[in-house]
């Protein structure tokens, strides 16, 4: 049966104009709330305000508007159940065939460094998840849309299927909804849990969308997948698909390089630094120091820098076989040179996003569950070193500076190992 009635209530209005106009062209009655209703009316579309539809006003500054039998009854009652249909008619409940809802931006709000608890709480959506879940539960009859990326697909399908969507599409959209609401609730749980040290000990929630299938795991016969917002931190500009070990190497490289303020180059293999060099001005000089530490390490390894990749260094690297190159930015000449390395994975690192991400604990699987550990974000400074002098002759300032540099490198080495580095 063709979609006849739709309820639209969104925070993100991306693509909404085209979608709403498309629904209107199919003769779909539009019901909406607050700012979304005003937006649709501004487009010249006929819209029924939710308060007119339910017969009840929006209350408590919009906190209560869609939690009503006219809404949830219209979503939940089964069209193939005679008793449901009878009760709906007796209570004046009309079927709502499509729900388009995206949620208050809670995750974006709490990601702000200066967010207050009150601001965070106001971005906890109640009506939105409730409508999404009601519609998703009854996906046999209701099309539920939680992502603007699905708007065009739905309109295309309505065009093909006489104003309706297929059961398979509705099922897929319902699964997407439950993933979204699960992610949303986990974000709220973790944020509020972090406000209380006691509550974080009781449980820990992990839920993230699939980012991409990885090329393989530790070995080619092992499947691997990457979840979460990795791409917001590390943007792959070119090269082969990432593998499981590539992702670990990229994380290790970021941990290493963000400890240094001066121009620095790191070379890593299997997450361990093999050479690190630093210079006051020129990345090429820093590279030369790192390279001379172990001239074999760059081949098939990971190279990371904490300054924009320059043409000079890119020219050197373009002649070497490397698996991954990471930089906060690449100038045009450097990109042109590195593009010739078609298989090399060129990564742009969003340093600010990485520094936020590394506040989260390290998570590792364990039999029957997983473990968490606070990430080692402490940086050993000169004051720390001077306080621990136990030799008869105290180190010189130059020696202390060298120790600090080497300490920051050696903390990235796993297990028992010796490491040489030059500043």
Identify the function of each model-found stretch.
Residues 1-53:
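N-terminal glycine-/serine-/threonine-rich phosphate-binding loop
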Residues 35-106:
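Glycine-rich nucleotide/cofactor/substrate-binding loop typically near the N-terminus or early
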Residues 79-129, 133-136, 389-397:
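Active-site/ligand-binding-proximal alpha/beta "capping" segment
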Residues 131, 138-154:
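Mobile "lid/hinge" segments at catalytic clefts and subdomain interfaces of large enzymes
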């Amino acid at each position: 049966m063709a979609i006849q009635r739709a309820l639209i209530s969104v925070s993100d209005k991306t693509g909404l104009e085209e979608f709403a106009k498309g629904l209107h062209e199919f003769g779909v009655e539009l019901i909406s709330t607050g700012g979304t209703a005003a937006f649709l009316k501004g487009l010249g579309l006929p819209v029924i305000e939710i308060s007119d539809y339910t017969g009840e006003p929006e209350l408590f500054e919009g906190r209560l508007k869609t939690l009503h039998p006219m809404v949830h009854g219209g979503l939940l009652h089964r069209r193939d159940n005679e008793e449901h249909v009878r009760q709906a008619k007796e209570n004046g409940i009309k079927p709502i065939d499509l729900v388009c809802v995206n949620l208050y931006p809670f995750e974006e709000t709490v990601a702000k460094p200066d967010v207050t608890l009150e601001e965070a709480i106001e971005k906890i959506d109640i009506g939105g998840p409730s409508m999404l879940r009601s519609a998703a539960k009854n996906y046999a009859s209701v099309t539920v849309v939680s992502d603007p990326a699905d708007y065009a697909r739905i309109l295309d399908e309505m065009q093909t299927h006489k104003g309706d969507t297929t059961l398979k599409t509705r099922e897929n959209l319902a699964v997407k909804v439950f993933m979204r609401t699960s992610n949303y609730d986990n974000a709220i749980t973790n944020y509020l849990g972090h406000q209380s040290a006691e509550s974080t000990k009781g449980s820990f929630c992990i839920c993230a969308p699939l980012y991409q299938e990885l090329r393989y795991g530790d070995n080619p016969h092992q499947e691997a997948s990457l979840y979460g917002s990795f791409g917001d931190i590390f943007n792959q500009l070119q090269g082969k698909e990432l593998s499981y070990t590539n992702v670990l190497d990229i994380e290790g490289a970021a941990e290493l390089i963000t400890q240094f303020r001066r121009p620095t180059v790191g070379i890593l293999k299997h997450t361990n630094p093999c050479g690190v060099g630093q210079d006051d001005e020129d990345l090429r000089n820093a590279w030369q120091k790192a390279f001379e530490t172990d001239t074999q390490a760059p081949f098939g390894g990971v190279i990371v820098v904490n300054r924009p990749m320059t043409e000079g260094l890119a020219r050197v690297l373009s002649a070497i076989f490397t698996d991954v190159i990471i930089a906060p930015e690449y100038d045009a000449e450097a990109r042109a040179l590195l593009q010739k390395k078609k298989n090399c994975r060129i990564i742009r690192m969003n340093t600010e996003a990485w520094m936020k991400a590394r506040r989260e604990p390290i998570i590792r699987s364990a039999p029957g569950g997983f473990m968490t550990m606070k990430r080692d974000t402490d940086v050993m400074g000169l004051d720390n070193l001077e306080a621990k002098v136990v030799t008869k002759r105290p180190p010189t300032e130059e020696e202390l500076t060298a120790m600090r540099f080497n300490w920051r490198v050696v903390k990235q080495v796993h297990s028992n190992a010796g490491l040489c580095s030059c500043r």
